[in-house]
């Protein structure tokens, strides 16, 4: 790796470049090793349940590493952090943020699910206003462009520099340039995700030449192999020392050769805190340089007795506060319930609850991890949050029959059961769809916004203030009131 002049580095280390120094060692501390601990796609999984191991176990492992003499820990999160669990969603991510502050995270990359409540909701946590909750760490993205200003959004940083006295570490954040399509179009309409690669090279060079960073990491909410290869291709000061991936919920601890000929770590750690990445960099104080990083993914299931009692108490208090709502028993499974059956049932629930001719959801909105559901299971509000963790609204419009036929062929759309396709013929309530007739169509907003065939050709478009999850809950309550079981 690049060798820095010791005298120059020590002079630069006296200057703070957006760093948090309170918990970092002074210049007299001898650091032999830096461990970079990373989680990605946490999705608000604070509790230990359903095969997820919880924030208390993650925090225990981080603190265990922090106690090792001669070693420092850099704690990072690669996005999709807040959205996805009852305890996190109910507070718009604030509960997760409080736990992360306690764990002393150093930086977080913005992921596609940070847009689910509008990006502005999440950015409130880095706006400097303590009254709405504030992160003790920055949110990073060098390639999200606000169309109104043609710059990165206010309160977002391109990178963070963490100062350890003997050396500085730069972390560059980015989001996959193709991930706009994974966000409801209305939530991302004011933003562009540009190709991050050139900017990462520029920032890496700036971090080394101007900020005195010996180590530079690229942390992306992305797992594009072509992007990884291009980022790794930089040499000289523009080279990075590790690439952190996210988004696909996969698990790997690979290496890739950078433009300087070094084998650098390339990692991702699954989802929901099931794994935690650890990248070890050994520091040579005489040469003021790092050896090549070595990556390892901790399987958190191997630490059943690991618990940070303070975090456990925090999470218990959070869950207890919402327990009267989340633990309400709203139905009982009348048979074995699969994901596909819930997709069909949910489309029917929207059709029943909204004045329309037909309804649809996207199958990806129902999460496979919530299944199986066995006959006799008591279904709570919390269980519906597991099944449908996203705060999707219903949209409604008028669609011409000729356009509706194309809509009915969308691959991952699940339509209400009053829709039937026989060969090349389309039926609604047993009647043939007529090309020139207008039909009222209700649809989950993600699918509605994504499909130009709907968004571009629909008329009289309405955004109904109805969450799909709330429609599911109310329909289940009605079944219970009528003495019926779910999908009996």
Task: Label every model-predicted segment.
Residues 26-33, 44-47, 59, 67, ...:
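Catalytic centers of hydrolytic enzymes
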Residues 25-301, 341-349, 398, 462-466:
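Acidic, metal/ion-coordinating pockets
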Residues 20-22:
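Bacterial signal peptide processing site
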Residues 15-18:
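C-terminal motif of bacterial Sec signal peptides marking the signal peptidase cleavage site
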Residues 2-9:
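Sec-dependent signal peptide recognition
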């Amino acid at each position: 790796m690049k060798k820095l002049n010791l005298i120059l580095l020590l002079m630069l280390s006296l200057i703070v470049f957006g760093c948090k120094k309170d918990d970092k060692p002074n210049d007299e501390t001898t650091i032999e090793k830096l461990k970079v601990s990373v989680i990605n796609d946490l999705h608000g999984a604070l509790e230990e349940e359903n095969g997820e191991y919880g924030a208390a176990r993650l925090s225990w492992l981080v603190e265990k590493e922090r106690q090792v003499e001669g070693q420092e820990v850099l704690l990072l999160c690669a996005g999709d952090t807040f959205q996805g669990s009852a305890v996190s969603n109910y507070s718009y991510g604030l509960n997760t943020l409080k736990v992360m502050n306690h764990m002393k995270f150093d930086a977080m990359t913005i992921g596609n699910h940070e847009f689910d409540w509008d990006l502005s909701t999440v950015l409130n946590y880095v706006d400097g206003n303590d009254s709405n909750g504030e992160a003790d760490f920055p949110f990073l993205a060098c390639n999200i462009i606000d169309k109104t200003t043609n710059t990165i959004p206010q309160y977002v940083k391109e990178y963070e520099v963490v100062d350890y006295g003997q050396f500085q570490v730069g972390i560059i954040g980015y989001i996959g340039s193709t991930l706009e399509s994974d966000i409801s179009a209305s939530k991302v309409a004011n933003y562009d995700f540009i190709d991050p690669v050139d900017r990462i090279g520029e920032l890496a060079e700036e971090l080394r030449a101007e900020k005195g960073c010996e180590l530079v990491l690229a942390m992306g909410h992305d797992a594009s192999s072509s992007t990884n290869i291009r980022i790794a291709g930089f040499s000289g000061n523009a080279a990075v020392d590790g690439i952190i991936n996210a988004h696909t919920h996969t698990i790997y601890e690979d290496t890739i050769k950078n433009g300087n000929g070094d084998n650098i770590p390339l990692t991702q750690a699954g989802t929901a805190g099931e794994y935690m990445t650890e990248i070890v960099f050994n520091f040579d104080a005489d040469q003021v340089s790092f050896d090549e990083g070595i990556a390892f993914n901790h399987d958190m299931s191997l630490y059943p007795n690991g618990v940070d009692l303070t975090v456990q108490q925090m999470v218990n208090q959070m869950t207890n506060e919402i327990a009267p709502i989340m633990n309400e028993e709203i139905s009982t499974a009348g048979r074995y319930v699969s994901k596909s059956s819930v997709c069909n049932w949910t489309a029917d629930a929207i059709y029943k609850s909204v004045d329309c001719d037909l309804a649809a959801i996207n199958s990806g909105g129902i999460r496979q991890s919530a299944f199986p559901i066995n006959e006799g299971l008591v279904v709570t509000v919390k269980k519906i949050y597991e099944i449908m963790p996203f705060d999707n609204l219903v949209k409604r419009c008028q669609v011409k029959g000729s356009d509706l036929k194309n809509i009915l062929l969308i691959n991952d759309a699940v339509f209400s059961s009053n829709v039937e396709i026989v060969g090349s013929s389309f039926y609604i309530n047993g009647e043939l769809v007529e090309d020139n007739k207008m039909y009222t169509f209700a649809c989950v907003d993600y699918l509605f916004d994504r499909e130009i065939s709907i968004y571009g050709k629909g008329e009289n478009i309405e955004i109904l203030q109805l969450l799909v999850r709330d429609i599911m809950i109310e329909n289940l309550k009605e079944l219970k009131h009528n003495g019926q079981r779910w999908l009996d």
